[in-house]
């Protein structure tokens, strides 16, 4: 998957207009609720999976930092996510399908936040972003 210059611009525009940590925490809460098996790696959260809970918020900070770095350097997402991919594969044992589930949850949260501004063009650009991120996070699995 590759992003056009217009899509890169749209992604950076979207990301600059949202509270990144809040959107990320809401996306994580949605994943944990809709796909409960994804909570198995987060036993330290003690079954507290709301966006406002400390464990979710702290993880949202880490995820949002990684996504912000990716969005800031869209030409090198695979390279920049290589170590994170290795960590998710070897240390954490994350199923790669979970990355796309989180991407889908982000799309819902972005659409809810942006409302009428979340045009089909924004949707396509954001979807492609999360496909790129999913590919990058999955690269060490192959």
Curated annotation (Swiss-Prot):
Pfam families: Globin. GO terms for biological process: hydrogen peroxide catabolic process. It comes from the Eukaryota. The keyword Amino-acid biosynthesis does not apply. One of its GO terms (cellular component) is hemoglobin complex. Heme b binds at residues 59, 88. One of its GO terms (molecular function) is peroxidase activity. PROSITE patterns: GLOBIN (PS01033). Red blood cells. Keywords: Heme, Iron, Metal-binding, Oxygen transport, Transport. Residues 2-142 form the Globin domain. PANTHER family: HEMOGLOBIN FAMILY MEMBER, HEMOGLOBIN SUBUNIT EPSILON. Heterotetramer of two alpha chains and two beta chains. Belongs to the globin family. Involved in oxygen transport from the lung to the various peripheral tissues. This is Hemoglobin subunit beta-2. It comes from Torpedo marmorata (Marbled electric ray). The lineage of its organism: Eukaryota, Metazoa, Chordata, Craniata, Vertebrata. The gene is HBB2.
